[in-house]
């Protein structure tokens, strides 16, 4: 755990193993209990006024520094952590934990400045100065993040922070290690204590603690539809005890598809079907799980598609000839095996 800028060792631990090498323990993780979660809520609330006072430019400077660090000396470290923790190939790690997160931090700052600059009042009567101020939520934001994108995991707590919010970061149990490395990066970039509090632990417990706190102000979530619906219901039940109406932002799963036109680029379609369905073992919300292909096109590409699928190599993420590696855990393996 990292609470108010300090590492906390609770003594309640779990291990993080490499998905493609179960005998290799990657990290021993100290899990947050209710006491640590309550302390994190308090730290986030106490840190908010100073974080607001830094101003938008000060906050953007910190997260643009995060992007610079990730584009530089931290790039290989974060990519390696993602390769080992989530069993991503070097290519998948690079487009995720480096490229996408660098873009998140830089574009978020760009658009935050745009909100501030572009929506100022057009007219101020003589003797009056009208202005618009970006105000954060009054309280803390709970960010519950997924395993499958290291970039999204860091974006969920940091996007609200850029506009002045403080909060709790509950990482997925399958990506504690890589997410912890990014928390260290943000601290090195100058993130003040208490702005983001890193809490590996039970999702049910952290939700219970957060919703019991009157200062709960928002949820930022990426994960399954069922879990998100359950959280929404719990927030609704908690409303009488909260100081404000929480903002709820969530992204959930889908059944993505590929539609082919009779005049399509058939080689391009073949590549799209292969990469869309099989890269990162299909563990993406953007993974292709259905295809609608005209019979004439299907007859032309079917044999090539089957042939290319048979050539896909699976194994250790450190072997750059492998296109696929392991799925994230036993539960995912059992689900796939049951199809």
Model features per residue range: what roles?
Residues 170-172, 200, 262:
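Short beta->alpha connector loops at strand-helix junctions that form conserved
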Residues 23, 44, 59, 164, ...:
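Residue-level signal for inorganic ion chemistry
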Residues 185, 190, 212, 218, ...:
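ALDH superfamily catalytic-core signature
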Residues 22-116:
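Glycine-rich loop-to-alpha-helix module at the N-terminal edge of alpha/beta enzyme cores
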Residues 159-161, 210, 240:
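Hydrophobic/aromatic ligand-binding patch that stacks against planar heteroaromatic rings
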Residues 130-132, 197-220:
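A structured beta-alpha segment of the ubiquitous adenosine-cofactor-binding alpha/beta core
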Residues 1-26:
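Hydrophobic face of amphipathic alpha-helices that form TPR/SEL1-like repeat modules
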Residues 118-193, 267:
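Conserved small-residue-rich beta-alpha loop and adjacent elements
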């Amino acid at each position: 755990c990292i609470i108010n800028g300090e590492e906390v060792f609770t003594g309640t631990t779990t291990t993080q193993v490499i998905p493609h090498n179960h005998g290799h323990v990657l990290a021993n993780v100290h899990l947050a209990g209710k006491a640590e979660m309550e302390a994190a809520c308090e730290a986030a609330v106490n840190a908010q006024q100073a974080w607001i006072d830094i101003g938008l430019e000060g906050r953007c400077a910190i997260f643009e520094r995060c992007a610079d660090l990730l584009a530089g000396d931290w790039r290989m470290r974060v990519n390696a952590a993602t390769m080992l923790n989530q069993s991503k190939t070097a290519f998948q790690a690079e487009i995720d934990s480096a490229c996408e997160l660098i873009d998140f931090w830089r574009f978020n700052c760009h658009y935050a400045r745009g909100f501030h600059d572009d929506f100022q009042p057009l007219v101020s009567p003589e003797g009056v100065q009208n202005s618009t101020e970006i105000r954060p939520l009054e309280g803390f934001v709970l960010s519950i993040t997924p395993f499958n994108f290291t970039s999204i995991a860091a974006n969920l707590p940091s996007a609200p922070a850029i506009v002045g919010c403080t909060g709790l970061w509950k990482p997925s149990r399958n990506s504690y290690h890589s997410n912890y490395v990014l928390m260290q990066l943000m601290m090195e970039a100058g993130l003040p204590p208490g702005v983001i509090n890193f809490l590996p632990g039970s999702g049910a417990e952290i939700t219970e603690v957060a919703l019991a706190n009157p200062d709960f102000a928002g949820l930022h979530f990426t994960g399954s539809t069922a879990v998100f619906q359950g959280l929404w219901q719990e927030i609704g039940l908690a409303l009488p005890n909260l100081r404000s109406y929480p903002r709820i932002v969530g992204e959930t799963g889908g059944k993505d598809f590929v539609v082919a036109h009779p005049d399509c680029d058939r080689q391009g379609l073949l590549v799209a079907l292969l990469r869309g369905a099989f890269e990162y073992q299909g563990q993406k919300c953007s993974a292709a799980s259905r295809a609608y292909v005209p019979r004439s096109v299907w007859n032309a590409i079917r044999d090539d598609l089957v042939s290319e699928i048979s050539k896909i190599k699976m194994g250790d993420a450190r072997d750059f000839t492998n296109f696929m590696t392991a799925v994230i855990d036993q539960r995912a393996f059992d689900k796939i095996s049951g199809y």
